[in-house]
Amino acid sequence: MGCFSKIAMLRQAALALALIGAGAAAGQAAQVAPHRAAYELTLDRATSASDVIDVSGTMDFEWADSCTGWTVKQKSAMTVGYSTGESAELGWNLLSWEAKDGLKYRFLVRDLQNGAMSDQFKGEAALDGPGRGGKAVYSVPDKKIVKLPPGTLFPTAHSLKLLENAEASHPLLWEMVFDGSDAKGLFGVNAVISPRLPQLSGGKLSSPLLATPSWRINLAYFAPEGQAAAPENEQHIDIHDNGVVDLLIIDYGTFRVRAKLTKIEPLRGPAC
């Protein structure tokens, strides 16, 4: 697995939290749950065809109300061990802001390898209106414009639609999503939403944020160009109706990475 692919693996794990965990509050004021969470990253399983034998790391996530929009902060670090005896130290940081009407988005993404920054993406994006297209303007690493097709959603708007579908027992959703996480930042996301999960008790974490209905959402990520038969990767997320994710599994075919919630705390909203 090349350097870029390794970092992209961690980026996709963190992206799932930004894509899901930021959106529940956007249209459901009674369930607003700005929060700070910590996750432990481990190797869930690997097939005999995989050269990955160990994964360990952490992922810190914060979602907050900024009055005019929603902010997401993430900091991730992961060590990947290979059957050759080599290992890679990977990191991924994200800071984003999305307007509450879902039409504007700003992002700053940094990829790290062995403690040094290997990539950086910065810019802003805007849609011409609900359901309409728009453009993303990158300022780092190079100045360029990415056209966004009609129907494109930003992460919070997408996650809101996911939870609306879950509440309404609508199991399928396909959308184009822009998040700025790489040089193109645009991808197709196919979602399959399970029926409501049974509410379990006696877990290691005790928080009112976890005492709410939840669903498992299976996400498949596709490149935006062409008609790819297979997704680049798949993810399985257990999410509560307040937007809190307590389990994330990233499936790369020959191995899976698990992100398990280890700490959760609510954040106070601002005095807008």
Language-model features and meaning:
Residues L108-C272:
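Mature, soluble, non-transmembrane domains
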Residues G27-T84:
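N-terminal cleavable signal peptides for secretion/export
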Residues G2-A14:
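Bacterial N-terminal signal peptides that target proteins for export
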Residues Q28-P34, E62-T71, W97-L103, S207-A211, ...:
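A short, structured loop/turn motif at beta-sheet edges
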Residues Q12-A22:
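Bacterial N-terminal signal peptides
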